Amino acid sequence: MNLHHLLKARRAAGKPVRVALIGAGKFGSMFLSQVPHTPGLEVPVIVDLDPERAREACRTVGWDAERIAATAFTPDAAKATAGPIEVIVEATGNPAAGIRHARAAIAAGKHIVMVNVEADVLAGPLLAEEAQSAGVVYSLAYGDQPALTAEMVDWARATGFRVVAAGKGTKYLPAYHDVTPADVWSHYGLTADAAQSGGMNPQMFNSFLDGTKSAIEMAAIANACGLDVPSDGLLFPPCGVDDLPHVMRPRDQGGVLERSGVVEVVSSLERDGRPVFRDLRWGVYVVLEAPNDYAADCFKQYGLKTDSSGRYAAMYKPYHLIGLELNISILSAALRREPTGQPADFRGDVAAVAKRDLRAGEMLDGEGGYTVWGKLMPAAASLNAGADAVVTRRAMEQRFGGVAQTKQSD
């Protein structure tokens, strides 16, 4: 609660926090919009495959000509680790590139804030371990839902509550698993032309809709918070904020969860397409359990919504502000040497499920594409099913799963 005070002290001492940004897309641009309004924070290097696009993004978000002229725009990621940079923000969205950039940052003694949740789910526990050995911070990105959820889980546990469930809200119907970039805009109430004029990527937005992004983010939360994942994928139950304590409790207590201590996503739509009352589409939540009758009585006395037993309650944030909130991660790493969420285990994985019959030899086109959607699975189950051909996955299993692997390929 004192980041602003610490930053003011750094500024007064003439030692601003210097950041390099890799990837000036939507998330990165939202972060850049806050930089001129955060005295003591500087971004001297911006890396993007299209430097002119990155420069234009700075103009769009309100940077003046002097600030732009003082910034190095480059396609060379190696420039991010040069000079007096303290924190590197990886916001490319490309998992292979993200892992390379993170390892280079760690090797150079820089803190790394991983906006790239795909890279985090693939190799986050290993990267966090590598960073710790190097004496730097590896952090999830505050403003995105995994870090915000991890914060709520930490709050609940630090105050003595058992976490029953944690996760986020989204717009979901079962039919969305089969949606492709060709028809995604109809589900957002947009025309293709309107989406294009707004710079919206159909495949990226389809990954939000078809369930893939939810699976990836819940895997990140499970790995960071030590929570379990559902044994057969996310349920996406329709649920508003007032019903969280009723719905998000174990089945033997009247809820939908197979057990306590899991991640789950709630839908803002009823299964017939009607909107859920007081939905949590843009927010995050944690459901907690009172440890005793006294705490349960306090829930009631202070107006906390509970289930019928009075023992289960929920806390939530109705919105997340993406890159507008990213400074919290950057300043936490630089000024407190503390992450805003960090993977510590390999508990959740995401498996590709075909959207249609696939031809032999057909190339999968990634999250939000035409061929597959991503399903959340327990990591142990995905590895046992054979999803361990990638070298990084073998390393994850060896380090965090306790199962020795001897072959390098199957």
Language-model features, listed with the residues they occupy:
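Short, ordered loop/turn segments at secondary-structure junctions
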Residues: L49, G93, V117-D120, G143-D144, ...
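Rossmann-fold NAD(P)-binding glycine/threonine-rich loop
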Residues: T92, A96-A108, V115-P146, E151-W155
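N-terminal Rossmann-like dinucleotide-binding module
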Residues: M1-G62
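A structured beta-alpha segment of the ubiquitous adenosine-cofactor-binding alpha/beta core
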Residues: D64-A96
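C-terminal catalytic/substrate-binding lobe primarily of soluble NAD(P)-dependent oxidoreductases
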Residues: N2-R10, H187-D410
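Rossmann-like NAD(P)H-binding beta-loop-alpha module
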Residues: A131, S139-L209
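Generic secondary-structure signature for well-ordered alpha-helical cores
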Residues: P36-G40, R59, W63-E66, Q132-V137, ...
